Amino acid sequence: MPKLSLLKQDGTNAGEITLNDTVFGIEPNEKVVVDVILSQRASLRQGTHKVKNRSEVRGGGRKPWRQKGTGRARQGSIRSPQWRGGGVVFGPTPRSYAYKLPKKVRRLAIKSILSSKVNEEKLVVLEGLTFDAPKTKEFATFLKNISVDTKALIVVAGESENVELSARNLQGITVIPAESISVLEVAKHDKLIITKAAVEKVEEVLA
């Protein structure tokens, strides 16, 4: 089972924590991780694109000229696709790009990316993380204490308003509750900082 140092908020050592082998110690499956990232990114697409076809473009109800005798090609409407200002053929319509992968695949992906962070020594476990009031300066000091100077995802147990507000103005720092942890969020950040209570919640769901 993976063992990591447990850090206090001031960066000092608070002992060790043993992580669950089935969540943080599996052989990472990169293919599954990529599949889930693509699925989650697809779900974020708006899909509100829309063009008008010939029946939706305003006007064009009258036949431009008579069928025969003019020497010109026959035309039924000035809103036909071949006309300037006409409707679009097979253009984009509103749709959802979302698709779901099996639950087993999604679980394997989150376990794989968590195990990757452990293998790459990019997982930091905190004894706890609390702030009496929203203070960006204090949060920046906390990051300095634990030697984090890159994009970091901070996972806490439940909602923590002061922590979220303190980190809001810091570029590259995202705070989420343990229930919202996702493959895409973990992949977007270089380091994963997680509290001991959040580790227990994640293990409870995934183990």
Swiss-Prot record:
Biased composition (Basic residues): 60-71
GO molecular function: rRNA binding; structural constituent of ribosome
Keyword entries, A-Z: Ribonucleoprotein, Ribosomal protein, RNA-binding, rRNA-binding
Organism: Listeria welshimeri serovar 6b (strain ATCC 35897 / DSM 20650 / CCUG 15529 / CIP 8149 / NCTC 11857 / SLCC 5334 / V8)
SUPFAM superfamilies: Ribosomal protein L4
The protein, known as: Large ribosomal subunit protein uL4
Xref: Gene3D superfamilies: 3.40.1370.10
Domain of life: Bacteria
Lineage: Bacteria, Bacillati, Bacillota, Bacilli, Bacillales
Stretches the record annotates as Disordered: 47-78
Any single Pfam family the record assigns to this protein: Ribosomal_L4
